[in-house]
């Protein structure tokens, strides 16, 4: 083996491992969904157990998808596949994806979106961002979540609100910064915010690019994260 063959591209090995883990977690989530469908929780303790399993599996799977996407973006292997989509379809795909999680945590999700509302974007990437926000809201909300999509001054706005305690000030101050609200002591690196920011920046129209906004005191009293696409 020559020197070139002996060089180990650790980032490639790591990305391959992440891909395998993502697939395994997908199978785990499917198994959990089937188990819940066949054997619904019989008491509060079982419901809480399923809730924790559903949330943690969904969260890790979402973060693995984000890591893979960011790796591909860094290596210029991630391209935006823009096409016209019905926004409600994208939202409902993510709701179906997290149905087990919402059931286990007894979360009521309200959707406000015109069925005829359409826009040009990469449905896989934007769907991944919406999914991550939903999973995050499922952890911090009390019992309600709202997803609203509308046209606002020439942009598409997808706003996801919950009835939790809202976003911390560090995240509100710099939602688009790579290190916004990083807290290793609390296990929070805000990978989701970095992923969302990068994906939105890839969506552009002329000089306009996508962006996100965070706010508190939303329609349900808690935080609201708004995605804007040109």
How does the language model describe each region?
Residues 32, 36-44:
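Short acidic helix/loop segment immediately C-terminal to the autophosphorylated histidine
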Residues 55-63:
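Short alpha-helical segment of the dimerization/phosphotransfer core of two-component systems
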Residues 75-80, 118-121:
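Conserved micro-motifs of the catalytic ATP-binding
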Residues 83, 108-117:
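Conserved catalytic submotifs in the C-terminal HATPase_c
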Residues 83-96:
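A conserved beta-strand-to-alpha-helix junction within the catalytic ATP-binding
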Residues 144-154:
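Short beta-strand/loop element within the Bergerat-fold HATPase_c
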Residues 167-180:
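Short conserved segment of the HATPase_c
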Residues 201-218:
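Glycine-rich ATP-binding loops of the HATPase_c
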């Amino acid at each position: 083996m020559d020197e070139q063959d002996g060089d180990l591209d650790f980032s490639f090995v790591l990305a391959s491992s992440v891909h395998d883990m993502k697939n395994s977690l997908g199978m785990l989530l499917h198994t959990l969904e089937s188990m819940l469908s066949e054997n619904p929780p019989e008491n509060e303790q079982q419901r809480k157990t399923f809730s924790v399993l559903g949330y943690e599996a969904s969260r890790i799977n979402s973060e693995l998808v984000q890591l893979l996407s960011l790796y591909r973006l860094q290596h210029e292997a991630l391209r935006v596949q823009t096409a016209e989509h019905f926004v409600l379809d994208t939202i409902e795909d993510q709701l179906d994806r997290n149905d087990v999680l919402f059931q286990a945590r007894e979360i009521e999700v309200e959707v406000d979106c015109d069925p005829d509302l359409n826009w040009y974007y990469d449905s896989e990437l934007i769907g991944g961002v919406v999914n991550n926000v939903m999973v995050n809201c499922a952890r911090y909300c009390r019992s309600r979540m709202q997803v609203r999509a509308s046209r606002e001054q020439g942009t598409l706005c997808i706003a996801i609100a919950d009835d939790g305690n809202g976003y911390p000030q560090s995240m509100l101050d710099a939602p688009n910064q790579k290190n916004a609200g990083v807290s290793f002591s609390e296990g929070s690196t805000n990978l989701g915010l970095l992923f969302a920011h990068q994906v939105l920046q890839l969506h552009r129209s002329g000089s306009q690019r996508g962006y996100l906004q965070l706010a508190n005191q939303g329609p349900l009293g808690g935080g609201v994260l708004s995605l804007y696409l040109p």
